[in-house]
């Protein structure tokens, strides 16, 4: 007689209970608040909704948020990758301290970060005074917004790329150099394919964080309409005016943009993984 297979005792409850808890948490934390947002927006007719979200000042705030968040995320992608590389490949005094400081923007209240960055970049601050000699203003300009978004976004890239770099065997780089590859070829043909999915993920999270950032930006931006006024500030202004329908309408557009960004991120990451997996397989076949 065949022995009946015994079911493995699982530490975590079975699929039914686990799935039910997951759906309940997802519903209370994510779905219900989003549905509330849609319900408040529904108080406006379709024409009123379109009029609200396409006013020149609102469109300008979208443009400022998108442009500054994109530029900051691109800079984060470059600087974050370099920082991750230094932390993984080199040993130096204070390495652990630097590794901990990178996570400071995660723990620091955004309002505190905004006040600190503003004092640093005004004409009386260290950075502001230095760049002021060259006629460059940071505080109360879009450059200040980008500076703040770089500060809050760079940990996303570093923490996404760092663990992947730790898994990349340095022998691959040594083998590439022995085969005559230049440093540039080693970076783009050996290292970049390994870290690209993580880099895309870190860039996207930095971009998404920048779009919704309020606390660290509101102090340094100056909040000049059509110049440095961001979309989250427009939402807050509408709430202070008790215009909840307009506030939720503007927020709904931002939510839609965030969903698009995350969807594109998922598609790019999956295609990138498939692309470089197939390339690696072709290389192995060629070697054989």
Task: Please name every model-derived segment.
Residues 162-174, 182-183:
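Membrane-helix/interface signature in polytopic inner-membrane proteins
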Residues 1-11:
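Short, Lys/Arg-rich, polar N-terminal cytosolic tail immediately upstream
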Residues 276-281:
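Conserved small/polar residues in nucleotide/adenosyl-binding loops
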Residues 220-225:
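Juxtamembrane non-transmembrane "cap" segments at the membrane-aqueous interface
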Residues 10-45, 54-166, 190-215, 236-240, ...:
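Membrane-water interface segments at the C-terminal ends of transmembrane alpha-helices
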């Amino acid at each position: 007689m065949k022995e009946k297979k015994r079911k493995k005792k699982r530490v975590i409850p079975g699929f039914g209970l686990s799935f039910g808890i997951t759906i309940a948490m997802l519903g209370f934390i994510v779905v219900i608040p989003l549905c509330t947002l849609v319900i408040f927006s529904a108080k406006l007719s379709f024409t009123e909704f379109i009029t609200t979200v396409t006013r020149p000042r609102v469109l300008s705030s979208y443009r400022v948020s998108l442009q500054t968040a994109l530029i900051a995320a691109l800079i984060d992608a470059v600087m974050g990758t370099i920082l991750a590389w230094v932390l993984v490949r080199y040993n130096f005094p204070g390495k652990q301290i630097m590794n901990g400081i990178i996570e400071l923007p995660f723990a620091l209240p955004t309002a505190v970060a905004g006040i600190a960055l503003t004092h640093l970049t005004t004409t009386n601050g260290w950075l502001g005074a230095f760049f002021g000699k060259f006629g460059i203003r940071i505080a109360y300009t879009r450059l200040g917004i980008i500076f703040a978004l770089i500060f809050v976004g760079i940990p996303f890239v570093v923490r996404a790329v760092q663990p992947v770099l730790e898994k990349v065997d340095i022998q691959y780089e040594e083998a590439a150099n022995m085969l005559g590859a230049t440093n540039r070829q080693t970076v783009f043909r050996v290292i970049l394919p390994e870290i690209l999915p993580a880099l895309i993920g870190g860039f996207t999270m930095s971009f998404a964080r920048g779009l919704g950032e309020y606390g660290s930006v509101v102090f340094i931006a100056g909040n000049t309409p059509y110049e440095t006024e961001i979309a989250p500030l427009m939402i807050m202004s509408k709430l202070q005016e008790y215009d909840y329908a307009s506030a939720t309408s503007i927020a709904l557009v931002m939510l839609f943009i965030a969903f698009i960004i995350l969807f594109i991120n998922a598609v790019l990451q999956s295609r990138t993984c498939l692309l470089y997996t197939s390339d690696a397989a072709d290389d192995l076949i060629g070697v054989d």
